[in-house]
A protein has these predicted regions:
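His/Asp/Glu-rich mid-to-C-terminal helical/loop segments that flank catalytic regions of hydrolases
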Residues: 275-322
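A short, charged, Gly/Pro-tolerant segment at domain boundaries
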Residues: 315-350
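Generic non-transmembrane alpha-helical segments
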Residues: 199, 203-214, 301-309
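Non-catalytic positions within long, well-ordered alpha-helices that form the structural scaffold/packing
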Residues: 139-142, 239, 258
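Metabolite-binding pocket within alpha/beta catalytic cores that recognizes anionic/polar moieties
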Residues: 53-193, 349-350
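Active-site/ligand-binding-proximal alpha/beta "capping" segment
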Residues: 211-244
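Zn-dependent metallopeptidase/amidohydrolase metal-coordination segment
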Residues: 248-286
Length: 350
Protein backbone atom coordinates (compact mmCIF):
# COMPACT_ATOMS: atom_id res chain seq x y z
CA UNK A 1 0.00 0.00 0.00
CA UNK A 2 1.40 3.33 -1.06
CA UNK A 3 2.08 5.92 1.63
CA UNK A 4 -0.23 8.91 1.52
CA UNK A 5 1.22 12.39 1.04
CA UNK A 6 4.30 11.22 -0.86
CA UNK A 7 4.52 12.16 -4.53
CA UNK A 8 6.75 9.96 -6.56
CA UNK A 9 8.34 11.75 -9.53
CA UNK A 10 10.07 9.94 -12.35
CA UNK A 11 13.86 10.22 -12.35
CA UNK A 12 15.32 13.05 -14.46
CA UNK A 13 15.73 12.18 -18.12
CA UNK A 14 19.25 11.77 -19.38
CA UNK A 15 20.82 13.16 -22.54
CA UNK A 16 21.38 10.26 -24.90
CA UNK A 17 23.69 11.84 -27.45
CA UNK A 18 26.02 9.45 -29.29
CA UNK A 19 29.09 11.67 -28.96
CA UNK A 20 28.66 12.40 -25.25
CA UNK A 21 30.28 10.12 -22.72
CA UNK A 22 28.15 9.15 -19.67
CA UNK A 23 30.52 11.09 -17.44
CA UNK A 24 29.66 14.34 -19.20
CA UNK A 25 25.92 14.16 -18.60
CA UNK A 26 26.29 15.94 -15.27
CA UNK A 27 27.87 18.86 -17.11
CA UNK A 28 24.60 19.43 -18.88
CA UNK A 29 22.66 19.51 -15.63
CA UNK A 30 24.74 22.55 -14.67
CA UNK A 31 24.17 24.21 -18.07
CA UNK A 32 27.83 23.84 -19.03
CA UNK A 33 28.47 24.28 -22.75
CA UNK A 34 30.14 21.95 -25.19
CA UNK A 35 31.26 24.00 -28.16
CA UNK A 36 31.81 22.27 -31.51
CA UNK A 37 33.12 24.44 -34.33
CA UNK A 38 29.79 25.79 -35.54
CA UNK A 39 27.28 25.05 -32.76
CA UNK A 40 26.80 25.52 -29.05
CA UNK A 41 24.74 22.76 -27.40
CA UNK A 42 22.99 23.36 -24.09
CA UNK A 43 21.20 20.62 -22.20
CA UNK A 44 19.16 21.54 -19.13
CA UNK A 45 16.50 19.86 -17.01
CA UNK A 46 13.07 21.46 -17.20
CA UNK A 47 10.58 20.55 -14.41
CA UNK A 48 7.76 19.83 -16.89
CA UNK A 49 9.55 19.06 -20.18
CA UNK A 50 12.35 16.99 -18.78
CA UNK A 51 15.75 17.28 -20.45
CA UNK A 52 15.83 19.80 -23.28
CA UNK A 53 18.54 20.12 -25.93
CA UNK A 54 18.70 23.60 -27.39
CA UNK A 55 20.84 25.36 -29.94
CA UNK A 56 22.36 28.75 -29.33
CA UNK A 57 24.52 30.90 -31.53
CA UNK A 58 28.19 31.27 -30.65
CA UNK A 59 29.06 34.35 -28.64
CA UNK A 60 31.02 35.74 -31.55
CA UNK A 61 29.24 34.83 -34.75
CA UNK A 62 31.47 37.04 -36.90
CA UNK A 63 34.89 35.50 -37.45
CA UNK A 64 37.86 37.66 -38.28
CA UNK A 65 39.29 37.14 -41.75
CA UNK A 66 42.33 34.92 -41.47
CA UNK A 67 45.69 35.39 -43.19
CA UNK A 68 48.91 33.40 -43.29
CA UNK A 69 51.27 36.15 -44.43
CA UNK A 70 51.57 39.48 -42.65
CA UNK A 71 53.10 42.48 -44.42
CA UNK A 72 54.23 45.53 -42.46
CA UNK A 73 54.68 48.55 -44.69
CA UNK A 74 57.04 51.29 -43.58
CA UNK A 75 57.89 54.77 -44.83
CA UNK A 76 56.44 55.23 -48.31
CA UNK A 77 54.40 52.01 -48.28
CA UNK A 78 51.03 52.62 -46.68
CA UNK A 79 48.86 50.33 -48.83
CA UNK A 80 49.29 47.14 -50.81
CA UNK A 81 48.15 47.09 -54.40
CA UNK A 82 46.27 44.22 -55.99
CA UNK A 83 44.42 42.98 -52.90
CA UNK A 84 41.27 41.07 -53.82
CA UNK A 85 38.41 40.56 -51.36
CA UNK A 86 39.99 43.27 -49.23
CA UNK A 87 38.52 44.07 -45.85
CA UNK A 88 39.56 46.31 -42.98
CA UNK A 89 39.89 44.62 -39.61
CA UNK A 90 40.24 46.53 -36.35
CA UNK A 91 41.64 44.42 -33.56
CA UNK A 92 41.85 45.19 -29.87
CA UNK A 93 44.81 43.57 -28.15
CA UNK A 94 45.85 43.34 -24.48
CA UNK A 95 48.64 45.76 -25.42
CA UNK A 96 46.42 48.38 -27.02
CA UNK A 97 45.58 49.17 -30.63
CA UNK A 98 47.81 48.43 -33.63
CA UNK A 99 49.15 51.33 -35.68
CA UNK A 100 46.23 51.18 -38.09
CA UNK A 101 43.33 49.00 -39.16
CA UNK A 102 44.72 45.86 -40.78
CA UNK A 103 43.67 45.24 -44.38
CA UNK A 104 43.20 41.58 -45.27
CA UNK A 105 42.76 40.19 -48.75
CA UNK A 106 43.96 37.73 -51.35
CA UNK A 107 47.17 38.10 -53.38
CA UNK A 108 48.22 35.40 -55.83
CA UNK A 109 45.68 33.05 -54.27
CA UNK A 110 47.01 33.49 -50.74
CA UNK A 111 45.48 35.39 -47.85
CA UNK A 112 47.59 38.28 -46.60
CA UNK A 113 47.23 40.95 -43.93
CA UNK A 114 48.71 44.41 -44.53
CA UNK A 115 49.54 46.83 -41.72
CA UNK A 116 50.90 50.36 -42.15
CA UNK A 117 53.58 50.63 -39.45
CA UNK A 118 53.39 54.42 -39.08
CA UNK A 119 49.65 54.62 -39.78
CA UNK A 120 48.14 56.08 -42.91
CA UNK A 121 49.54 59.52 -43.57
CA UNK A 122 52.66 58.65 -41.55
CA UNK A 123 51.39 59.86 -38.16
CA UNK A 124 53.39 57.72 -35.71
CA UNK A 125 57.03 58.18 -34.70
CA UNK A 126 59.26 55.07 -34.50
CA UNK A 127 59.32 55.42 -30.70
CA UNK A 128 55.52 55.74 -30.56
CA UNK A 129 54.72 52.62 -32.60
CA UNK A 130 52.85 50.00 -30.59
CA UNK A 131 55.08 47.15 -31.75
CA UNK A 132 53.56 44.60 -29.38
CA UNK A 133 50.02 45.32 -30.55
CA UNK A 134 51.10 45.12 -34.20
CA UNK A 135 52.75 41.71 -33.89
CA UNK A 136 50.07 40.35 -31.54
CA UNK A 137 47.29 41.40 -33.94
CA UNK A 138 48.96 39.67 -36.90
CA UNK A 139 49.36 36.56 -34.75
CA UNK A 140 45.65 36.66 -33.89
CA UNK A 141 44.76 36.80 -37.58
CA UNK A 142 46.66 33.56 -38.13
CA UNK A 143 49.83 34.92 -39.74
CA UNK A 144 52.85 32.65 -39.40
CA UNK A 145 55.15 34.77 -41.57
CA UNK A 146 55.83 38.52 -41.46
CA UNK A 147 57.49 40.47 -44.25
CA UNK A 148 58.64 43.94 -43.24
CA UNK A 149 59.42 46.78 -45.64
CA UNK A 150 61.29 49.85 -44.40
CA UNK A 151 63.51 52.75 -45.42
CA UNK A 152 67.17 52.71 -44.37
CA UNK A 153 70.33 54.74 -44.77
CA UNK A 154 73.46 53.17 -46.25
CA UNK A 155 76.75 52.96 -44.35
CA UNK A 156 78.65 51.44 -47.29
CA UNK A 157 79.70 52.86 -50.64
CA UNK A 158 78.58 49.70 -52.42
CA UNK A 159 75.06 49.89 -50.96
CA UNK A 160 73.60 52.60 -53.14
CA UNK A 161 70.30 54.48 -52.81
CA UNK A 162 67.59 52.74 -54.81
CA UNK A 163 68.90 49.26 -54.01
CA UNK A 164 67.38 46.76 -51.57
CA UNK A 165 69.01 44.79 -48.77
CA UNK A 166 67.68 41.74 -46.92
CA UNK A 167 69.23 42.06 -43.47
CA UNK A 168 70.38 38.91 -41.68
CA UNK A 169 71.66 40.63 -38.50
CA UNK A 170 70.51 43.44 -36.23
CA UNK A 171 72.14 45.66 -33.62
CA UNK A 172 69.78 47.27 -31.12
CA UNK A 173 70.53 50.85 -30.03
CA UNK A 174 66.96 51.77 -29.11
CA UNK A 175 66.27 53.30 -25.70
CA UNK A 176 62.59 53.88 -25.04
CA UNK A 177 60.76 50.74 -26.19
CA UNK A 178 59.29 47.58 -24.78
CA UNK A 179 60.61 44.78 -26.97
CA UNK A 180 59.18 41.72 -25.20
CA UNK A 181 55.77 40.19 -24.54
CA UNK A 182 57.01 38.63 -21.33
CA UNK A 183 57.21 39.79 -17.74
CA UNK A 184 54.31 40.04 -15.34
CA UNK A 185 55.31 36.80 -13.66
CA UNK A 186 56.52 34.91 -16.73
CA UNK A 187 60.19 34.89 -17.76
CA UNK A 188 61.33 33.78 -21.21
CA UNK A 189 64.64 34.03 -23.07
CA UNK A 190 64.41 33.22 -26.78
CA UNK A 191 67.43 32.40 -28.92
CA UNK A 192 68.17 35.34 -31.20
CA UNK A 193 71.58 34.67 -32.73
CA UNK A 194 69.92 34.46 -36.15
CA UNK A 195 67.21 37.11 -35.86
CA UNK A 196 65.58 36.58 -39.25
CA UNK A 197 64.06 33.51 -40.88
CA UNK A 198 66.55 32.15 -43.45
CA UNK A 199 63.85 30.54 -45.58
CA UNK A 200 61.78 33.71 -45.74
CA UNK A 201 64.86 35.86 -46.39
CA UNK A 202 65.80 33.65 -49.33
CA UNK A 203 62.32 34.04 -50.82
CA UNK A 204 62.53 37.84 -50.52
CA UNK A 205 65.99 38.06 -52.09
CA UNK A 206 65.00 35.75 -54.96
CA UNK A 207 61.86 37.82 -55.54
CA UNK A 208 63.95 40.98 -55.86
CA UNK A 209 66.11 39.29 -58.48
CA UNK A 210 63.03 38.05 -60.33
CA UNK A 211 61.67 41.61 -60.44
CA UNK A 212 64.96 43.10 -61.67
CA UNK A 213 65.71 44.96 -58.43
CA UNK A 214 69.34 45.00 -57.31
CA UNK A 215 69.45 43.29 -53.93
CA UNK A 216 72.09 42.51 -51.31
CA UNK A 217 71.32 39.17 -49.68
CA UNK A 218 72.72 39.92 -46.26
CA UNK A 219 73.89 42.76 -44.07
CA UNK A 220 73.78 44.18 -40.57
CA UNK A 221 70.99 46.63 -39.77
CA UNK A 222 71.65 48.91 -36.80
CA UNK A 223 68.43 50.16 -35.24
CA UNK A 224 68.61 53.60 -33.62
CA UNK A 225 65.89 55.22 -31.52
CA UNK A 226 65.39 58.35 -33.59
CA UNK A 227 63.54 60.35 -34.60
CA UNK A 228 66.66 62.44 -35.26
CA UNK A 229 69.14 61.15 -37.83
CA UNK A 230 72.73 60.29 -36.86
CA UNK A 231 75.44 62.77 -35.99
CA UNK A 232 78.54 62.62 -38.18
CA UNK A 233 80.47 61.05 -35.30
CA UNK A 234 77.81 58.35 -34.91
CA UNK A 235 77.83 57.62 -38.63
CA UNK A 236 81.61 57.13 -38.63
CA UNK A 237 81.35 54.94 -35.53
CA UNK A 238 78.72 52.76 -37.19
CA UNK A 239 80.91 52.36 -40.25
CA UNK A 240 83.96 51.55 -38.12
CA UNK A 241 81.99 48.85 -36.31
CA UNK A 242 81.10 47.20 -39.60
CA UNK A 243 77.38 47.93 -39.81
CA UNK A 244 75.77 48.15 -43.25
CA UNK A 245 72.48 50.05 -43.00
CA UNK A 246 70.72 52.11 -40.36
CA UNK A 247 67.02 52.36 -39.57
CA UNK A 248 64.64 52.95 -36.67
CA UNK A 249 62.13 50.08 -36.52
CA UNK A 250 63.06 46.55 -37.55
CA UNK A 251 64.89 45.12 -34.56
CA UNK A 252 61.93 45.63 -32.23
CA UNK A 253 59.63 43.84 -34.66
CA UNK A 254 62.11 41.01 -35.12
CA UNK A 255 62.40 40.39 -31.37
CA UNK A 256 58.65 40.31 -30.85
CA UNK A 257 58.08 38.13 -33.91
CA UNK A 258 60.58 35.61 -32.57
CA UNK A 259 58.80 35.54 -29.20
CA UNK A 260 55.49 35.04 -31.01
CA UNK A 261 57.06 32.16 -32.99
CA UNK A 262 56.57 33.93 -36.32
CA UNK A 263 58.96 33.89 -39.27
CA UNK A 264 60.27 37.41 -39.85
CA UNK A 265 62.39 39.02 -42.54
CA UNK A 266 62.82 42.53 -43.84
CA UNK A 267 63.26 44.29 -47.17
CA UNK A 268 65.38 47.36 -46.42
CA UNK A 269 64.97 49.99 -49.14
CA UNK A 270 68.11 52.13 -49.25
CA UNK A 271 67.25 55.81 -49.61
CA UNK A 272 70.44 57.71 -48.74
CA UNK A 273 74.04 57.61 -47.48
CA UNK A 274 73.17 58.90 -44.01
CA UNK A 275 75.59 61.82 -43.41
CA UNK A 276 79.05 60.24 -43.78
CA UNK A 277 79.50 60.29 -47.57
CA UNK A 278 81.61 63.27 -48.73
CA UNK A 279 79.98 63.24 -52.16
CA UNK A 280 76.40 63.41 -50.85
CA UNK A 281 74.55 65.91 -48.74
CA UNK A 282 73.39 64.94 -45.26
CA UNK A 283 70.15 63.01 -45.21
CA UNK A 284 66.85 64.90 -44.99
CA UNK A 285 63.27 63.74 -44.70
CA UNK A 286 62.44 65.24 -48.09
CA UNK A 287 65.31 63.33 -49.70
CA UNK A 288 64.08 60.05 -48.24
CA UNK A 289 60.54 60.63 -49.47
CA UNK A 290 61.74 61.43 -52.98
CA UNK A 291 63.76 58.21 -53.19
CA UNK A 292 60.97 56.18 -51.62
CA UNK A 293 58.52 57.35 -54.24
CA UNK A 294 60.85 55.95 -56.88
CA UNK A 295 61.21 52.65 -55.02
CA UNK A 296 57.58 52.15 -53.98
CA UNK A 297 56.59 50.52 -57.25
CA UNK A 298 59.54 48.14 -57.05
CA UNK A 299 58.52 47.19 -53.52
CA UNK A 300 54.97 46.43 -54.65
CA UNK A 301 56.25 44.11 -57.40
CA UNK A 302 58.64 42.36 -55.03
CA UNK A 303 55.93 41.80 -52.43
CA UNK A 304 53.56 40.26 -54.95
CA UNK A 305 56.29 37.97 -56.26
CA UNK A 306 57.30 37.00 -52.72
CA UNK A 307 53.73 36.09 -51.79
CA UNK A 308 53.43 34.04 -54.97
CA UNK A 309 56.72 32.22 -54.30
CA UNK A 310 56.06 31.59 -50.60
CA UNK A 311 56.09 27.84 -49.96
CA UNK A 312 53.43 26.23 -47.82
CA UNK A 313 56.02 24.21 -45.92
CA UNK A 314 58.26 25.68 -43.24
CA UNK A 315 61.90 24.61 -43.19
CA UNK A 316 62.97 26.71 -40.22
CA UNK A 317 62.83 26.68 -36.43
CA UNK A 318 60.83 29.87 -35.94
CA UNK A 319 57.60 28.09 -34.97
CA UNK A 320 59.32 26.42 -32.01
CA UNK A 321 61.17 29.42 -30.62
CA UNK A 322 59.55 29.11 -27.18
CA UNK A 323 60.07 25.36 -26.81
CA UNK A 324 63.10 25.86 -24.55
CA UNK A 325 62.66 29.55 -23.73
CA UNK A 326 60.01 29.59 -21.00
CA UNK A 327 61.77 29.59 -17.64
CA UNK A 328 59.07 30.15 -15.03
CA UNK A 329 57.31 27.20 -13.39
CA UNK A 330 53.87 27.11 -15.09
CA UNK A 331 52.23 26.64 -11.69
CA UNK A 332 53.53 30.04 -10.60
CA UNK A 333 52.51 32.04 -13.68
CA UNK A 334 49.61 34.41 -12.84
CA UNK A 335 46.34 33.50 -14.51
CA UNK A 336 46.06 37.01 -15.98
CA UNK A 337 49.44 36.62 -17.69
CA UNK A 338 48.47 33.23 -19.11
CA UNK A 339 45.25 34.69 -20.45
CA UNK A 340 46.97 37.73 -21.96
CA UNK A 341 49.58 35.61 -23.74
CA UNK A 342 47.36 32.64 -24.61
CA UNK A 343 47.74 33.07 -28.41
CA UNK A 344 51.53 32.94 -27.95
CA UNK A 345 52.11 30.45 -25.11
CA UNK A 346 48.90 28.43 -25.26
CA UNK A 347 50.49 25.28 -26.64
CA UNK A 348 53.05 25.29 -23.83
CA UNK A 349 50.87 26.50 -20.95
CA UNK A 350 47.23 25.52 -21.64
Amino acid sequence: MACRGVIRRPPPARCNLPFIQPSTVDLFRSNARIEPAALHLRCAFHPRKGTVLSKTKPKSAAKRPQASIGIIGGSGLYTMKGLFESKEVRIKTPFGDPSEAIVTGVVEGKRVAFLARHGRGHRILPTEINYRANIYALKLLGCDRIVSVSAVGSLREELAPGEFLVADQFVDRTKHRVSTFFGGGLVAHVTFDKPTCPQLSSVLADSCVHCGVKVHRKGTYICMEGPQFSTLAEAHMHRFLGFDVIGMTNVTEAKLAREAELCYSSIAMITDYDCWHPGHESVTGAQIVATLNQNAENAQHVLREAVKAMPDEHHCKCAGALAHALITDPKLVPAATKKRLAPIIGKYMP
